[in-house]
Amino acid sequence: MFQDGSRSSGSGRGLSTTAVSNGGWRTRGFLRGWQIQNTLFNNIKFMILCCFVTILILLGTIRVGNLGSSNADSVNQSFIKETIPILAEIPSDSHSTDLAEPPKADVSPNATYTLEPRIAEIPSDVHSTDLVELPKADISPNATYTLGPRIAEIPSDSHLTDLLEPPKADISPNATYTLGPKITNWDSQRKVWLNQNPEFPNIVNGKARILLLTGSSPGPCDKPIGNYYLLKAVKNKIDYCRLHGIEIVYNMANLDEELSGYWTKLPMIRTLMLSHPEVEWIWWMDSDALFTDILFEIPLPRYENHNLVIHGYPDLLFNQKSWVALNTGIFLLRNCQWSLDLLDAWAPMGPKGKIRDETGKILTAYLKGRPAFEADDQSALIYLLLSQKEKWIEKVYVENQYYLHGFWEGLVDRYEEMIEKYHPGLGDERWPFVTHFVGCKPCGSYADYAVDRCFKSMERAFNFADNQVLKLYGFSHRGLLSPKIKRIRNETVSPLESVDKFDIRRMHMETKP
């Protein structure tokens, strides 16, 4: 029932709605038209009212203006009457604009007009804008303009950072370069000093005092990893020197600007000789060389009658005159007069610039296999020893019985074989004393070998040597390419037994031939 009633009610309501809707649209249309007309009429009335108000305002303004004009005219007439007597007293040639200026003193017609008391003559060709500037001294048209007193001539190719450096003395191209004042009696001077200073002996515990000298450039490496491996190389050298009672100096200063690159070692060696007379041997070692036989010791008694010990091959030196017959990356030089004389004869071939370039041409022509490039310290030493053989060669020991210099490429891949077959203390090809990474240039931006191979090989060499140091403490690297370590023996209640057995300082193994 509820549903049927709903439908019926809905039908009736729908019919009535339709009827109302038709009548409603007519009514609404009429009302909307009336509203539009009413709104339009109101807008017209508002516009008329605005125009009327505007006219009233304009009329009021005109009247006020007329009143103002009348008042202004009366005031002007009064002012003119008062001014006429005054104007009659003013000369006829005076300008009206001068009335506002204060009275001036009489000016002589022959006097020169000035704004202030006379300071300096102003040239006739000076621009008006220049009058506010201080007077300038006369400038000769042929003079050279400068910002201040002349300090020094600056070459056109100078870098901006070089301007902060003090001026350098000119070096004559014909002058012979020297490392310093010529010393002729160093042996006697040193002997006297040693006698006067017994607390600094040149022989300690029966061994000649050695100072290991190494170093690198003053600035950082081109690549951060280069600094990392330089640090490892320094650590390796410190370990060896600590275990063998050798002093070490790491130099990063360029002591002589003329001797750069390979040549920086010469002034350093000479300086240390003269500053440490207690040192018997200066041992130079390149930064890219590593000790890989920590147990091996330099057989100094073998060199009792020699002053220079350097790795090389006599046949390559004397018969073939090869430029790689010797290697100046690692050598020992006795602190004596002979060595100072050798340095004095060696250094003049190294000053950078024209001397080094011209000497390089001579060395390339003289030595077998040498490429054409500027003079290097190694070629220069070989040339010196061959060209002045009678003077030098008697005191030179060309060492090849052990690896004072061991070329890395034929060694680093054999370390596992060496560990399996041999033992440290041999120093030769069975267990190389030094592994030298010639051509890798870990600190430079370029190298003669693949960078990745060089750094991996240096890592192997370092860990190979470091295992010999860690053995005393009961540790070893997990692998030759791993920086991580592992324990190789347990701790005991009798640790001194391990010290006596593994301490390199107490081990005296003879080097086998």
Curated annotation (Swiss-Prot):
Catalysis performed (reactions): Transfers an alpha-D-xylosyl residue from UDP-D-xylose to a glucose residue in xyloglucan, forming an alpha-(1->6)-D-xylosyl-D-glucose linkage
Location in the cell: Golgi apparatus membrane
Domain of life: Eukaryota
Transmembrane annotation, as ranges: 40-60
Gene Ontology CC: endosome; Golgi apparatus; Golgi membrane; trans-Golgi network
EC number in record: 2.4.2.39, 2.4.-.-
Predominant localisation class: Golgi
Glycosylation sites: N76, N110, N142, N174, N490
GO biological process terms, semicolon-separated: xyloglucan metabolic process
Protein family per UniProt: Belongs to the glycosyltransferase 34 family.
Protein name: Xyloglucan 6-xylosyltransferase 4
